[in-house]
């Protein structure tokens, strides 16, 4: 609390059975958030939960069919629906290759766990853009931290294995959404995408603006990149 005193503790056994083959019970609880009614929402693996402060689980729901690998963030919208960051199973790319996607899908689910809407980032953005990927410090932010690679940047090879590694194209970690925000003023979502930038996307799945380097964006997105100005509206360079 505000005095620094412990008021509440969740014992790990409540959501962990120590069978690390079971993604739903590994104990990898993420995005623990207190919502308007005082309860906590969080997710792990293929399930998302709601629990009150005395430990009563009020919701234990599986992701909608076809979606996998929840992690990082979920938020509750003003209407009570949830926005979840997930991947998609058996996704068919335009070249015909079928993959499991990595951290590049946002879904809206209702109180029954049913799918309401989807933001399919490979179709909305450009999974081949590699400008931020190539600037990554592999010793600091990649999945398997290796201090020996500190200062080395990622390669983003088009022939890299299809797996959870930084790389271009769907089936690799080309996006890496870290957080979601919702803007009720225009029914849009704002995503912090580690490998692309901070991007606002409308309900119509159109990009409203991009906060980040202008490098590498195609003509479709160039006018969406925000330009820095000072307090007088003068462009900063």
Locations of the language-model features?
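Histidine-/acidic-rich catalytic cores in large beta-rich domains
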Residues: 1-237
């Amino acid at each position: 609390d505000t005095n620094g005193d412990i008021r509440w503790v969740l014992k790990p056994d409540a959501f962990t059975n120590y069978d690390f083959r079971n993604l739903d019970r590994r104990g990898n609880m993420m995005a623990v958030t207190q919502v308007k009614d005082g309860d906590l929402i969080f997710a792990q693996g293929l399930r998302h939960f709601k629990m009150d402060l005395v430990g009563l689980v009020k919701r234990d729901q599986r992701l909608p069919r076809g979606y996998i690998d929840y992690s990082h963030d979920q938020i509750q919208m003003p209407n009570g629906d949830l926005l979840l960051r997930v991947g998609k199973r058996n996704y068919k790319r335009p070249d015909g290759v079928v993959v499991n996607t990595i951290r590049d899908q946002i879904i809206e689910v209702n109180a029954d766990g049913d799918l309401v809407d989807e933001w399919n980032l490979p179709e909305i953005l450009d999974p081949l853009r590699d400008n931020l990927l190539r600037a990554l410090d592999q010793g600091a932010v990649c999945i398997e931290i290796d201090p020996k690679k500190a200062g080395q940047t990622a390669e983003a090879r088009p022939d890299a294995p299809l797996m959870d590694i930084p790389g271009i194209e769907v089936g690799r970690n080309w996006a890496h959404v870290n957080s979601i925000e919702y803007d009720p003023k225009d029914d849009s979502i704002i995503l912090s995408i580690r490998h692309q930038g901070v991007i606002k996307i409308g309900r119509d799945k159109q990009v409203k603006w991009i906060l980040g380097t202008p490098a590498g964006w195609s003509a479709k997105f160039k006018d969406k990149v925000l330009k820095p100005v000072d307090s007088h509206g003068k462009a900063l360079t």
